């Protein structure tokens, strides 16, 4: 069933969430009945055609409606405003006329079964009938007109029998399209043309900064009745709804309001924060029957200004009014070692916060305008005395919606709330942000739900309560209570609101500041003798205390474990060994002189409590272990410096020569080729003593024919390292067998193939063996040494390369023209059929064919070098 009871234009308040261009928006509201009976919702759209739905307010969750609100700031001025309070948010709606505001309030109060909470000051106990009818006193409400001032009775529910005649009142709005439902038509319109006082507007003089703390003291039945009978006669200045079950509640509210007014008149003023911004709206303020002029006169004549409140109207305050310095404890909290609480501690903007306020991040759940006195967002100012705080903390009853945001938008903004420190207001000034303006907000009527017959004094809207402040703090020695409190407060995924919605019984939670609700370290600060904090997950700690839980970290491992001295081990505790005794034994084996000291220190529970300070971490707390990588702390006293699996021990126990680039080896003296054939086999079986010996045996070089000046250009290389060459005999310079045979050095850079220089000897064989792995490759020159060469290559895990250049490219011998892959990429062209062998001393130095086939190939590297060579060739052709 989608029946519309009421509709019209209203101006909706912006949200406190940091959205782009948040403003007071004009929306078209419709009051509709839901799918089931007695279910109502308030929908609002961008236009009167109801095409684009912007949001829905569930009136089943409505707890309270404040009528006659006024908002005045630099940019907005709303005279006819009311609010709808739900457990999750509070909506502030402004109408164009007072008639529209009254119509909306009456309709919402009827569908939500809300009643005026101020009736106790207007009617004696005997003035209420025993039936379900509500009594309505019609009186002056500036702007409406009626011929007589009368008293009529009407039923707020369709089930009641009596219906009052409808008062025909013209619509003063004119612009709003209103449909008056039947439930509204039963309401007589309060008006009085003869007594139209436009100044008789109720003002709230108990308005305090950020939060308003009210003392809802408990009274017994006799006190309630006596206080109700002492009230002045009913004033004709309100339009009210009551039933018989609401009288006791109303009497209690009246008595509490009168007492509160007397206590607060000495410090009552319109509170403005330090930067000229009022962040909180009053929630539980009781009306004082004063006009604006009377309130101003009383404020300027009898009010004694509090030194903690600023008199400046702008965003800045005089330096004389800035109170800072050493923060103090909350009122009523005894100092460590003291038996009595602080008797007089004037509340200043800073001293009701925790001492570590500036070092601790602010609470996530307090971002936005918060109305609770115990969940402050930033330094707060209160006008209450210590006695009021004590009374308030002793028997405070709070509503479910007290902790909710004041100004909220209709749209569901799902993104997280950014911190206020990160908002650059100079780049995005908002014309609707309440916190950027100084404003005055008052109300003239309040409607809330009434208890059942014979029920408690407190209405159901206030069934969830907390014991507040110092009166409910545990004793200094109650460590278990503080531990439980820390566990409750450390879960920041559940906001304080979730606690209120889910709790069925009052929780003994001390009323701490917003920083205390965030960090368990501050909870530990309450207990002076407790030096350690509860482990938490995502809350950085203050610099005031060590971050780690020293009892947990040091109680399980010795001081000499690598975790204490190794920064890597300290940063990765999840990989540490569980066997701490083995770790201590390893450390003692590495340092035998420290074994006794290690045992002595490890046995002392308080000997090592120096852990890193001034550090934040978001890592989850885990059990600390002894080392990072388990093999790092293995016993390696008997292990050789070289891993035997990777580098087997060679014959003779000599170290293996590293495979270095050719540029890193020193120059080698030339060795005759005649020595090569006799010693190649022995060189493979027994490695030379040093790298020079290896190079001499593996690099036969007939350097006797001349120096570097006598060499042909083909023998010169562009590298800076000296070259060891074997020049053939003059008689064999043009031998056909050596015409196409060249040995090129093994290089890691790609090289191009080259041809003989026209002026160079065609049979010259150049061998460049620069590494230890190349020495084993020379065994392939003889047939007898070939099996040994292959076995040695497999043993050493070394690779052998030969580059046979048989192409007909230009003979320019260039460093970039050599390629390791030439031997294998062109092996099918005849290079594999070439055989070479050393000759005897004094014989011809030209290479001769042999039956040895070069098959020691690393295919991975061969393919890699082949690709490099091809890329070089392709880039050179371009």
Curated annotation (Swiss-Prot):
InterPro entries in the cross-refs: Gab1-4-like, PH-like_dom_sf, PH_domain
Record field: compositional bias (Polar residues): 160-169, 707-718, 760-770
Residues recorded with modification Phosphotyrosine: 801, 854
One of the protein's GO biological processes: R7 cell fate commitment
One Pfam family per UniProt: PH
Molecular functions per Gene Ontology: SH2 domain binding; signaling adaptor activity
Quaternary context: Interacts with DRK.
Protein name: Protein daughter of sevenless
This protein's encoding gene: dos
